[in-house]
């Protein structure tokens, strides 16, 4: 007999002798941490799972843009990230960058996956990050809820 409970952001499953605890991580924080990783390492990034994780979340989960903005600022500040407009523009130009396309193809092959396509991943990042990044560099509060069904903010 297994009983499960949800406590705040923790979920535990109990049977007679074992307690397994799963800590849930807010999707906004996962997106922010992966995004900062991408901005830090740029094309020198070796593990492209950051891109895949962001893509998967943006395709399936509704997100609070304000929380994403706050998390990017918090994580970026801790890692001493430079918050300049050009930084995001450079990453978004990787959509047509042959080197990054090849890296993505190699990553998918290693992971034994055939999709998503690099251009599709980058198109979704282009839809999500520019308005959040603009608010960050202008020191504004971003208000917007990401709707995965529409692939845009409301």
Predicted regions and their residues:
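Single conserved hydrophobic/aromatic residue that forms the stacking wall/gate
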Residues: 1-8, 12-13
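Short, cationic low-complexity segments
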Residues: 10, 14-23
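A ubiquitous short alpha-helical element
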Residues: 19-20, 38-41, 87-92, 112-113
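Phosphate/pyrophosphate- and phosphate-bearing ligand-binding catalytic cores of soluble enzymes
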Residues: 23-48, 52
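Short helix-capping/linker segments at secondary-structure and domain boundaries
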Residues: 42-44, 59-67, 132-138
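Small-residue-rich helix-loop
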Residues: 51-98
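Long, low-complexity C-terminal extensions of enzymes
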Residues: 89-154
């Amino acid at each position: 007999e297994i009983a499960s409970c949800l406590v705040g952001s923790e979920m535990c499953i109990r049977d007679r002798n074992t307690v397994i605890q799963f800590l849930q991580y807010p999707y906004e924080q996962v997106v922010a941490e992966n995004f900062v990783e991408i901005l830090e390492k740029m094309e020198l990034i070796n593990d492209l799972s950051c891109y895949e994780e962001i893509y998967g979340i943006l395709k399936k989960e509704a997100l609070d843009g304000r929380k994403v903005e706050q998390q990017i600022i918090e994580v970026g500040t801790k890692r001493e990230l430079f918050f300049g407009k050009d930084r995001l523009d450079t990453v978004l130009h990787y959509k047509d960058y042959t080197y990054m396309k090849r890296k993505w193809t190699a990553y998918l092959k290693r992971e034994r996956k055939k999709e998503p396509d690099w251009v599709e991943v980058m198109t979704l990042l282009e839809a999500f990050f520019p308005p959040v990044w603009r608010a960050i560099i202008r020191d504004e509060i971003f208000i917007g809820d990401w709707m995965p069904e529409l692939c845009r903010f409301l």
